[in-house]
Amino acid sequence: IQYQIIILPAAQKSLSKLPKKMQLRIQGAITTLASNPLPPVTKKLVGRDTYRLRTSDYRIVYEIQNNILTVTVISIGHRREVYRHN
């Protein structure tokens, strides 16, 4: 089953500000979510219906809508700051 990936504009903006090498790494991680939205390294965020995927010092925060097979990337950022904006 393939999930559709939606990246919210704020997450896309954050991604575009990162170094090119990190952008490619994060884009690769996001792409893998289409075939497996809950890889073993994913953690559910406490008190929210969102998950986080670690990529080096950066985090991808996303939610899964299983009923419509969609993964929505909410935010992308450095581990120190990504949780503050949600």
Regions from the PLM with identified roles:
Residues 29-54:
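A short, surface-exposed loop/turn module that caps and links secondary-structure elements
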